[in-house]
Curated annotation (Swiss-Prot):
Molecular functions (GO terms): structural constituent of ribosome
Identification of the protein by name: Large ribosomal subunit protein uL29
Thylakoid is among the record's keywords: no
GO CC terms of this entry: ribonucleoprotein complex; ribosome
Family: Belongs to the universal ribosomal protein uL29 family.
CDD domains in the record: Ribosomal_L29_HIP (cd00427)
Entry-linked InterPro entries: Ribosomal_uL29, Ribosomal_uL29_CS, Ribosomal_uL29_sf
Annotated NCBIfam families: L29
Species lineage: Bacteria, Pseudomonadati, Pseudomonadota, Betaproteobacteria, Burkholderiales
Keyword field: Ribonucleoprotein, Ribosomal protein
Amino acid sequence: MTKAAELRQKDVAGLEAEIKSLQKAHFGLRMQKATQQLGNTGTLRTTRRDIARAKTILAEKQAAK
């Protein structure tokens, strides 16, 4: 889980890279769930929320400019 304080310290490019990596991880987890290889389905929820958290902070930074 990524904390909001950690994300706020990153610049816009860093946030975009973080979002991209989280989306890749989320896709992999979804594929594991579809093939019934994922044991802990709660990781899907936390990954989805981490993506939303990062996107929110990115939007805040872009609006501040």
